[in-house]
Amino acid sequence: MKSNLSLKRQDEKRADKEPNLYTLQGVIQYLQYEAFKNERDHNLWEIERAELKIRVAQLERERAKLEQSLSFQQRRAEMLEKSLRELRKDKNISVKDLDEFHLLDKPAANNTKADAEACLLKSKNYIKKSLQEIVYLTNMQPNVSWNVLQEPTRGIKVPKESNNTQQNNQFVMEPSQNKGNVNDANFFEVEYARNENMNKLSSSELISDDLLEDEIMKPLSSGESLPKKEEEVTKSPSFTLDDSVASNEQTLAQLNIESPVDQKKSKAKKKKEQKWTLKFESDKGTSTQCITHQPLPGSTPSFASGTENGVINVWRLDEDSNDNSMGIIKPHLTFYGHEGPVLCVCVPKATHHIFSGGHDGTIRCWSLPANQTSDSISKILTGSTIFQGHEDCVWELFCHEVKDNNPILLSLSSDGTVRGWKYTGEQLFKIRCDSKQPLSMSVTDSRIAIAYNDGNVRFYDLDTQILVSQMRIAGNSAIGNPAVKDRINKIVWKNGNPDRLYSLHENGMVRVFDVKSEELLAEKSISKVSLTGIAFAVNRPEFAISASDGRVFFLRQDDKLSTLESLPSREAQEEITDLSDILWINSPVDKLEHLIVGCKERISVYDRKYLP
């Protein structure tokens, strides 16, 4: 009695010294982990089961091929026997000769039959070994304790192993009254036992073809009879593959674990949500009429613009030459000389010059300073070469530079002419269409496309200035309203397969035509105001269009001109006559795309990461 009391006191002291290590949060985490592990193992078993079904189907197809080959050999043997009988009936061949031929062919026939039997025996042995492999894989499963997260619908009884090695271990469903015992234990255990009898099958035993399907689905030993088909056999709770996948996703969600599929979707969503951000703006009051690209050599992105007060500004998109803290962009170079607004700017690739056309009807050639010191940047440059010949406003300029040909400067004016110039100022040719006003132009290697106010685009040969063809893309704005609403503002010729002609209109319509077939490929109304500028992405089938209110729309180059996104203007303008232009350039150094938008009040520079 004393010993029992002393032991009890020692246990109480030990219990007081040892703290309780079990907490509610720890138990919940442990149970969640065990549930996740059980669900994962169950999903792996379901996947392995599906793979085994595929393997069984492959074996069945191989068996069908072997049976077909055997049937073909039997038919061939019957045909040979029939031909032999016909030869024996022939009167021209004696019985002695037939007997000699028969004796010669008999060993060969016997050999063929023996080979066929050997092939059939080999095939059946291969199928039998495959069945042994399937039974081995299905029976060699680990002992798994299922935690009862959900109430089981059936109990599973595991019979004890017997000493007789010829007896197979089967799993028989118990009646529903055993369900209470399972719930009392809070778990049920499934034991898998290896079928030892399958390893003792001799090579002389052959599987009957009639029982092959039943043997694959429910393997039996050679000494047992076939079970009844009504008897249901199971080894684990019945779950479909879809149910197990859904259960796994639910478990992952409860444990706050992100699946690989969700990770890929989140990455794609982040890439899709990448937007343009405003980086620089010019001082308010910089009224821009036109924008062009790359006037300066080097890797720093730059552009030139013309203003209403006759000034040409050259800008650089680097943080050193701009006030990055305030987000203000400053002109790098300034040229002045036009008597009125600058309507167009063009920069050739071969020389360090800038061409500009103005409201005063003149074209001016400006030289970029070789040494761009602080003095040349701070002061206004006024020296220029004047090209005279136009009698009215010069609206568009285009530098046409083709290999092995002299470069040509093309100009479009309100005086009704399109003229070609040398870079030195000498006029080469003049294209005029009687009583028609040119509105816009675009050039390829050997032809120039000119849009007129009668709604037609006329194609001329650059060498001979001869009209090649024409097609209608808009209404005749020369007759006044309502056709003036469909007036052409700008055209762009893009080479490709096929060559396409893009047109922007006064009524906010954009159209795409096939140049060769003159067929309308796409048409879309994207704004209620006039469209003024267009710029194409370098490495993707996308382009941007600017409207007269300063807004920018991004479209895809497909049959529907799908809208991608839009940039709202900083201050929407009520008037629809305020012009704007747009430029889209890539910067390989900092891996950024730049979008320059020039409107009435300012120049805005947006950028985003380069999208391959």
Swiss-Prot record:
GO terms for biological process: asymmetric protein localization to old mitotic spindle pole body; negative regulation of septation initiation signaling; regulation of signal transduction. SUPFAM superfamilies: WD40 repeat-like. Residues 39-100 form a coiled coil. Residues 219-241 are annotated as: Disordered. SMART domains: WD40. It is found in: Cytoplasm. GO terms for cellular component: cytoplasm; FAR/SIN/STRIPAK complex; mitotic spindle pole body; nuclear envelope; old mitotic spindle pole body. The keyword Repeat applies. Keywords: Coiled coil, Cytoplasm, Repeat, WD repeat. WD repeats lie at residues 286-325, 337-376, 389-432, 434-470, 483-523, 526-565, 574-612. This is Uncharacterized WD repeat-containing protein C1773.01.
